[in-house]
Design a protein with these regions (language model features):
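Alpha-helical transmembrane segments and their immediate juxtamembrane cytosolic regions
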Residues: 1-388
Length: 388
């Protein structure tokens, strides 16, 4: 989310390729999860635990923002950092609106060209096609969102709040974290959320998901130094592995009917519903458990991070926003193709692999494009000489 290319404002920092790796893996998972009935999507995290790629994206976005903009706040450049963050929020908003328009066009063309209204109903654009004059205004206010376009509005709201969050984490970190946790609890108790149109609320409740984002920003500012001992303790590792195993067993009951009967009724009442919209605590704990294991066994100096094997995923992670937008189009294109040909398992695998490889190719092109020298950049004015 933060722009690592900002110079002059931000202190130079070595890039943690683990973040790019996890963003790249997350982009592949989102692409596969957005293809209905795709057998390859069984490889994604949501089928084996409470959390999924959404938790990773929100945490990493917060961590990166804290890591990148924290030094600016510390150097009393709050206004400059706030200006940069507001500009970033505007960029995300423009990206969302363009993605919305092209996505609507893609789905509506498929629905009309192949006389299949199922696409309009599946992706929640049927009302837009009937009343475009009303719905475009609601879309501009982020109240109307087709299926699969919920995450960027969440980021926009979080980035808008980021200057205040970073200031609080720098001045009063304990109180800011406590306030975030209290806000999360109150939002869940009183059902606080932003309204959607024509009915309902936001799929990703920003009042709940801010907790993970704020925690990520705090970890980024402090480089997680204050919890390093806790993360590396044997007791925390055992608890993390136990929670991951428990989550796996519960999720398996969703897929294997006879396992469901083995879960006590009292436990069912405690566990469910495991709500994604309001960031259920079980999902949050599962993500934190995975993060503990990942940080423990994948250090930032891991040689594989510089290998050719992981390079494609890291490239995707380094171009997260454009690749996410591309993935939205590719997931619908894959769904459309499989519906039209009534694709079998082989077709599902081929389409999924082709989409993932295309994401890698586009990420490679974007990286090459960014590496090109800017021959039209204005030369910097020489610094004024000091009087002796």
């Amino acid at each position: 989310m933060a722009d690592r290319n900002d110079t002059g404002l931000l202190a130079p920092a070595e890039r943690d390729l683990r973040l790019d790796l996890m963003r790249g893996i997350g982009q592949w998972m989102v692409f596969l999860d957005h293809i209905p009935y795709d057998i390859v999507s069984w490889l994604t995290l949501r089928n084996y635990g409470f959390s999924d790629a959404a938790e990773f994206f929100v945490f990493i976005s917060g961590y990166t923002a804290g890591f990148v903009y924290g030094p600016a706040i510390a150097n009393r450049q709050f206004l400059a950092a706030a200006k940069r963050l507001l500009k970033r929020a505007w960029q995300l908003y423009i990206a969302h609106i363009f993605l919305f328009l092209f996505f609507i066009a893609q789905i509506s063309r498929a629905a009309r060209r192949f006389d299949n209204p199922m696409y309009g109903n599946e992706y929640n654009i049927f009302l837009f096609l009937e009343h475009p004059d009303v719905m475009i205004g609601q879309a501009l206010m982020l109240k109307f969102k087709p299926v699969d376009l919920d995450v960027l509005p969440l980021y926009i709201v979080l980035v808008l709040a980021l200057p205040a969050i970073l200031w609080g984490l720098f001045k009063r970190p304990a109180w800011t974290l406590l306030g975030s946790a209290i806000f999360y609890v109150l939002a869940r108790i009183f059902d606080w959320n932003l309204p959607s149109f024509p009915s309902g609320n936001w799929y990703f409740n920003p009042f709940a998901w801010q907790l993970l984002f704020v925690f990520g920003a705090w970890c980024g500012i402090t480089k997680a130094a204050k919890i390093t001992t806790l993360i590396r303790s044997r007791a925390v590792m055992i608890l993390a592995l136990a929670w991951i195993a428990f989550s796996f067993l519960i999720v398996m009951t969703w897929h294997v009917p006879f396992l469901d009967a083995l879960v006590p009724k009292w436990m069912i009442h405690i566990i469910y519903p495991i709500d994604k919209s309001d960031l259920d605590m079980f999902r949050l704990l599962h993500f934190l458990a995975l993060a503990v294991v990942f940080v423990r066994y994948v250090p930032s100096s891991w040689p594989m991070l510089h290998s050719r094997v992981l390079r494609p995923l890291i490239l995707i992670g380094q171009n997260s926003l454009p690749i996410f937008c591309l993935g939205v189009f590719l997931s619908f294109a894959a769904h459309w193709f499989l519906v039209q040909i009534e694709g079998d398992v082989v077709a599902q695998i081929l389409v999924s692999v082709a989409g993932m490889m295309l994401m890698v190719a586009v990420a490679w092109v974007l990286n090459r494009f960014k590496a090109l020298p800017d021959h039209f950049a204005l030369p910097k004015a020489p610094a004024p000489e000091r009087a002796v």
